[in-house]
UniProtKB/Swiss-Prot annotation:
Species of origin: Dictyostelium discoideum (Social amoeba)
Composition bias type Polar residues, residue spans: 765-781
Catalytic residues in the record: 592
The name this protein goes by in its record: Ubiquitin-like modifier-activating enzyme 1
Superkingdom of the organism of origin: Eukaryota
SMART domains per UniProt: UBA_e1_C (SM00985)
Length: 1017
């Protein structure tokens, strides 16, 4: 059985589909991936996770091999099986069609013959999932001898192991996937050391022995032609390249760029590793005995299974003791001690099958397959163990065996691992999933397999306001091409109902925020057991975090960036919240650098993006506001005069110089070329000539400042023409003029445009970030001249009534449509400006990534992160102690896994014996007068309130005059709020959140206290 497809010699990569993956991997890596054939043996939950991720990643072909009939227990984690297939259909055949539907570019086959040597030779990579050890050893021996990359992986309850054998002399072409470090040079000494100093804004991230190349160095220009040079680091800003005494002295400019070196690694067969205990990859630095014990433990359960024809029985102490005895004989060193508790846990759950572990091990394995076929990133070398014992029931050993026995349910794999009691709790949970994108799809799949919300009292709410785009299909696996433009939340909900028809799921398309609190109200939040964020923006994350703190709900938080991922669990009254610790804001590009002194392609791309926004969106929006909003002109008076003049001038130009046909759009584009890439550069050089020196005698054009060169328009230059084509077509769209894509027509018309000669102006140009911009000088001076010019323009503008119904089409930037000229314009504009400043240009792909702020994304990372989130969810359900929870920081590329205990909620002291955290508050139940409120806090809590507020409304203060104070003391808090805020209290809410400033009545000291939740309704 197979899916037919046309196989080309070099497969064409669908940039629109693989867009986010390409930013994590590169086109070169994708070419290798799309030429790779993979065999996956074992199609239960672990195997299907690997297959799903590889299919979405776009390998050439995946062959499925598993002739065993579907069992009911498989449905614990195999999301492409149905109850109707149990006992009737082979596993590979049962999931074939649904795997086919994942990606039209990937060939899917089912093999129902034998795993013969000739058959295995067809594949670049062979993966064995949850297979007997004897088969692992046999297939690995053949693969190693025949240079076929081999991976075996298995999960047993909360335990997992993964083994890689990529053969001898395996070449890693890129160990970490990061862009090579590049630095701007400040100076190079002419001596024996040859010390290179980079500009101060940067910090070296180079190590001794790294190789670097030079370019654009002036003076010591011979460095530009040298092969990669080995360096020795000296300080955070300097390194040595050796003797430069025979080279001319350095004068200016130049970049130094890290050269990535390939790394060659040898892999040994599985038999050797099991015998020697070598090449164990550590996954958790705090679990010192885990590798020793699980190396023996996994072999022991396989030996037990080989002898008894079944894995150890669930929670069976007799079987566990037998496994312990086998494991003792497998310890490598005389002083090794067996952790009998760990081996018992492994034996108890050896038949366990939980979707979080399948997601984690499956995602990691799929990433290892991609490493094997591409050489991109560092593989696990060679044997790795994983466990999540912290999520097992605390009293596991003392619970009765009956609690863990299968009941003929689709959740049997989970019951074997955690017991029936916990399974019942999971099914009756109410959870709110915020976001149905990549992580959201994985979470919904995990919820469906776990049965979360599938019980009579259970429910999953999911919201996402976005619709499905083609680029989503590569990693948001619940969507198909037929779903494009459909709502994500509803489509995802429909998809997981197919996976588990018992799942109770409600889909919404409302964003979360203050404006939707009438929907996501107190009743809604009070009905929840917890919230899971699957968001891609900090603002929404912070909002949901604040709501979870207010309502006292657990929050599961996560994020990904390429191969990197992180998770955080927020537990009421136990941990800090998401907003308690945040990353510093990203450093922006200084305005003067952007406008006048770019030195990197990122600067020119951002300038081009801003230019696009100004020309095709802001101008149109301003015109439309002028024509439709009577108060618009008045509102402009609040802006500084320089900005107001600029805005009015653009409105005048947009209305009075509006094009009537496409030829006029071409003429406008040609004049814009002259303005941006010739006149503005001529003006800059007029103000700051190339030979200019500063007051200290150093050249003005040095360090990060690169002297630009004006461009002379050449109608035969493809880049010049690309700008004209894109700019003219966007201008035409603004004005509703029919587009033109005939290059010859545009070329001919552009060549005939009459362009005025450049005349320099007397203007001040900002030269550093610390220097005030010209516009702020104007504002400080009063801006009288600008005011007069504004009045003149206003008198010349047509009245809105004269142009009733007229509108300019505003263009909203859309990065993922290759036909709309948006990225074409930004790429051409950026590269022309880069040419001005002798900066290496960027292709469309790189430009799109930077201009569109595209976050690199991989389905493998997403799957692993969602798995780790669900492990924490299982702990939350059991109310685990703080030390049992883990925040995860990982990078599948290096690879690295870090697990740390969440930070406890900080305690604030009011007085001896009385502390509070962000989770605490005062509760006042019932609407009372201000006097009663003040008395309550004085008598009950010993707090003398000096100030009371609600949001921005001050309700009470000690300094209020006596008469006003007496009037307010008699008023109820609700009445007081409505009177002072001039807003009615919402009828659908019950509470106000009040803030108080107060003193301790015993000591008179100011004290910090929690908020007050005041029930008025």
């Amino acid at each position: 059985m197979s899916k037919p497809m046309d196989v080309e010699q070099e497969p064409k990569i669908d940039d629109a589909l693989y867009s986010r993956q390409l930013y994590a991997l590169s086109h070169e890596t994708m070419k290798k991936i799309t030429s790779t054939s993979v065999l996956v043996v074992g199609l239960q939950g672990l195997g299907i996770e690997i297959v799903k991720d590889l299919s979405l990643a776009g390998v050439k072909s995946v062959t499925l091999y598993d002739k065993e009939l579907v069992e009911i227990k498989d449905l614990s984690s195999q999301f492409y099986f149905s109850p109707e297939q149990v006992g009737k259909v082979g596993r590979a055949d049962a999931c074939f069609q649904k795997v086919v539907d994942l990606n039209n570019y990937v060939r899917i086959d089912v093999h129902n013959g034998e795993l013969s040597d000739e058959f295995l030779k067809k594949f670049n990579v062979v993966v064995l999932a949850n297979q007997p050890l004897a088969l692992q050893l046999k297939v690995n021996e053949f693969c190693h001898a025949n240079k076929i990359h081999f991976i075996s992986v298995e999960t047993r309850g909360v335990f997992g192991q993964l083994f890689n054998d990529f053969g001898e002399q395996f070449t890693i072409t890129d160990t970490n996937g990061e862009n090579p470090n590049a630095y701007m040079i400040s100076s190079i000494s002419q001596d024996k050391e040859g010390i290179v100093t980079v500009v101060e804004e940067q910090k070296l991230q180079l190590l001794d022995g790294d190789l670097v190349t030079f370019k654009e160095v002036n003076g010591m220009s011979a460095l530009n032609d040298l092969p990669p040079q080995k360096i020795k680091t000296i300080s955070p800003l300097t390194f040595s390249i050796g003797d430069t005494t025979n080279l001319p002295p350095y004068t200016s400019g130049g970049y130094v760029t890290e050269v990535k070196q390939p790394k060659v690694v040898d892999f040994k067969p599985l038999k050797n590793i099991l015998e020697s205990g070598e090449n164990i990859f550590i996954t958790d630095d705090f679990k010192f005995t885990q590798p020793t014990n699980l190396l023996a433990g996994f072999q022991a359960i396989h030996k037990f299974a080989e002898k008894n024809k079944h894995m150890p029985r669930p929670h069976n102490k007799e079987d566990a003791n037998a496994v312990i005895e086998i494991a003792k004989g497998l310890l490598k060193k005389p002083d090794d001690e067996l952790d009998e508790k760990m081996i018992t846990q492994l034996s108890f759950g050896a038949q366990g099958d939980i979707v979080p572990m399948q997601a984690i091990l499956g995602g990691i394995t799929a990433q290892e397959v991609l490493k094997a076929c591409s050489g991109k990133f560092t593989p696990i070398h060679q044997l790795a163990f994983f466990d999540s014992v912290e999520c097992l029931p605390e009293d596991l050993e003392t619970l009765p065996e009956e609690e863990f026995q299968p009941i003929g349910s689709r959740y049997d794999g989970q019951i074997i691992t955690f017991g029936k009691t916990l399974q019942n709790k999971i099914e009756n949970l109410n959870y709110f999933l915020v976001g149905a994108g990549a992580i959201g799809c994985e979470m919904l799949k995990n919820f469906a397999m776990m049965g979360l919300g599938a019980g009579p009292k259970g429910l999953v709410h999911v919201t996402d306001m976005d619709t499905i785009e083609k680029s989503n299909l590569n990693r948001q696996f619940l969507f198909r091409s037929s779903d494009i433009q459909q709502l994500k939340s509803q489509t995802a909900a429909n998809a997981v109902r197919v996976m588990n028809p018992d799942l109770n799921v409600k889909a919404y398309s409302l964003r979360v925020g203050p404006d939707t609190e009438s929907h996501y109200n107190e009743e809604f939040f009070n009905s929840l057991d917890g919230v899971c964020n699957a968001l891609d923006n900090v603002e929404a994350r912070l909002y949901m975090d604040s709501q979870c703190v207010y309502y006292g709900k657990p929050l599961l938080e996560s994020g990904t960036l390429g191969t990197k991922g992180n998770t955080q669990v927020v537990v009421p009254h136990l941990t800090e919240s998401y907003s308690s610790s945040r990353d510093p804001p990203e450093k922006g590009i200084p305005v003067c650098t952007l406008h006048n002194f770019p030195n990197a392609i990122e600067h020119t791309i951002q300038w081009a993006r801003d230019t696009f926004e100004g020309l095709f969106k802001n101008n149109a929006d301003n015109v439309n506001s002028y024509l439709t909003n009577p108060a618009y002109v008045q509102s402009l008076k609040t802006q500084n005069p320089f900005v107001r003049l600029e805005t009015l001038a653009s409105i005048k130009a947009s209305l009075m110089d509006r094009p009537l046909d496409f030829n006029q759009c071409i003429a406008w584009a040609r004049l814009k070329f002259e303005e941006y890439f010739n006149n503005n550069i001529e003006q800059l050089l007029y103000n700051f000539p190339k030979d200019m020196v500063t007051t200290t005698g150093t050249p003005f054009w040095s360090g990060p400042k690169r002297a630009p060169t004006p461009l002379k328009f050449d109608v035969e230059n493809p880049l010049h023409l690309e700008f004209i084509v894109a700019a003219a077509n966007l201008r035409a769209f603004n004005y509703g003029i029919k587009a033109e894509t005939n290059i010859e027509v545009i070329q001919k018309q552009a060549a005939n445009v009459i362009v005025p000669d450049f005349t320099p102006k007397k203007v001040k140009i900002q030269t550093s970030e610390n220097e005030p911009a010209p516009s702020s000088n104007t504002q400080q001076a009063g801006g009288d001249a600008e005011d007069d010019q504004c009045d003149t323009i206003l008198s010349q503008l047509p009245q809105p009534s004269e142009m009733a119904g007229y509108k300019i089409n505003s263009i909203q930037f859309e990065k993922d449509d290759d036909t709309n000229h948006h990225i074409d314009f930004i790429t051409a504009t950026s590269n022309l400006r880069a040419t001005n400043y002798a900066i290496s240009p960027a292709d469309k792909h790189k430009t799109k990534g930077i201009a569109g702020k595209i976050i690199p994304a991989l389905v493998t990372t997403t799957a692993v992160v969602a798995g780790f989130v669900c492990i924490e969810l299982i702990k939350v359900i059991q109310n685990k102690a703080l030390e049992k929870y883990k925040s995860t920081f990982m990078n599948l590329g290096i690879p690295f896994f870090g697990f740390v205990e969440p930070i406890a909620a900080p305690k604030n002291k009011i007085r001896e014996g009385w502390t509070w955290t962000l989770w605490d508050r005062f509760d006042v139940d019932g609407d009372i007068t201000l006097k009663e409120f003040l008395d309550l806090f004085e008598k009950k809590h010993g707090l003398d309130i000096s100030m009371l507020s609600c949001k921005v409304t001050l309700l009470y203060a000690l300094f209020t005059d006596k008469k006003t104070k007496e009037e307010r003391l008699k008023m109820k808090i609700s009445q007081l709020y409505e009177t002072l805020s001039k807003k009615p209290l919402p009828k659908d809410k019950k509470y106000l959140l009040l803030e108080i400033c107060c003193n301790d009545t015993e000591t008179g000291d100011d004290v910090d206290v929690p908020s007050v939740r005041y029930k008025y309704n």
